Every structure is written in C-alpha cells, then in structure tokens.
C-alpha cells in the first residue's frame, strides 16, 4: 500500500502543472454537432489525448470499475435513517477508482446521487462516500442490487452543488417528473426511464451524438452543451482515459436535460466564446468563474475534473 501511495503522489506531482486551461486544451468550434435541441462542442487536448504518464496509476471511472468488478457498493448498515446519506465502497484491485459528483447509483434501499468527486485508493478497508436520495418515498428493509444509473441532468446537478439540501433535491426531482408528465409509478428520478416515449426520444439523441464521437479523433477530453439561447454546462476531464469511459453516462445526463427543458438552438458563437474564455483562460480566471457556476475537483493540486453550468435559482 505504501508503495502504491508513493507512486500515486509522484504521478500527481509530475502532472500538477498540466491544468485544464487553454495551455493544454482547445475548444473545437469547427467540429460542433447539433441534433434537434442539443448542440455539443468538443474540447480537445492539445497534441492529442496522449497516454497518461503511467496507465497503471490512473484512476478508473466508477461505471467502468463497477462493470469490471473492481469495486462493489453496499448500504452502510441498518435501515436507520442515519445511513441514508452514506454508501459503502470496497475496492478489489490495485487501481484507484474515480467517482464523480452527480453520478447516480440505483438500487439498494433507495436510489442515490453521489455528492462530490472522490478518488478511492486501493484498500482492504471499507470506504464511505456521501450521497443524496433521488427516490423519495422508498426506504426499504429489502435491498435491491446496486447498479449504475448514469449522470443526473444539469438542473439536478446544479441543485446538488449549490444547496446540498435533500429537500430541495426531492423538490427538483418532483418538478421534473411533473413537468415531463412521464408515465411511471414512483417518485424516483430514474422512473422516467419507464416511459416508452421518453426512451424513444432519448435513444434518438444518444445514437446521433454517440456516432459523432465515435467518428472523430480520439483526443476529446470534454465538451460544452447548448440548448436554446443558453449554455447548459460543460464537463472537462484530465485525459481521454477518464472522459471516454464516462461519455455515455454524460450524454444521457445532457440528453435528459434537453428532453425536459430544451428549445431550438438560437445561441450564437460570441457568447459561447466568452463563456469558454472565462473558463479556460488561466487558473485564476477558472477559479473565479466556477465560484457560482460550477466546481473544480483537484487531487494534490492537480485538476481532475471541471464542471460548469448556467446559474439559476434552485427550486424552493
């Protein structure tokens, strides 16, 4: 374990200067893709995505780790309500696991949403991660099998990051379910996936953008998303090895946002350029920009993930 920690610290120190700004990235406006009410502009690493300094040291995204059995998720303990806001993670390899705030874990006693970005180092001990409930009304004695539920949409992620308030998260989920008039039988955020019409629309969007990403150069590390006259948000990661395994769940989250509140694209390029310039000009500008419009996750001073959104007042 000490051997691994030494090399992980070395990796962080060696890469600490490579922050997620225009120094290392560029926004590929010429490769923007648009389908119906969603426009996506890829963000690329200069000089290609490139292999990380040491592939064995790079964290594995949660969805990949779950599918490969590198990590398991269980309830923290009994049905006591003090356990609602925690999940227990156990790693089963020598690789760290990267968990992103806004990812949804389905099952257990109720569906949950990860509160903040976290890196789980390999350990034989239990590790506990803070979560919020996104399934009001079910806290069952019987546990369902845990599964991966994609990223939440941008509105719900904003409420999570700006309030960390369980009641406001439930209200936002309820608002979305009511506004969408989804054919479902619960108050769960994921219940919209029971609606056949929703699934058909979502699949149409997903196939279009998934195909575009599959056909472009593999140096993309993030993207900015637009609908109507506004920027929905952006997600940028430290390398292709983190971005591509999370591409599908990220797309599902942004597509869900557009299905619920998207409008025909009217936003011109200049406001997008100003938005991205403020975000990527340099580290100081980035820190100031995300103060009320997103978050930056760092590990040892090294930026792992930048997520932004359009500031709006959360549901009260």
Residue ranges and their predicted role:
Residues 1-21:
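Bacterial Sec-dependent N-terminal signal peptides
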Residues 19-92, 96, 102-121, 126-316:
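Intrinsically disordered, low-complexity segments enriched in small/polar residues
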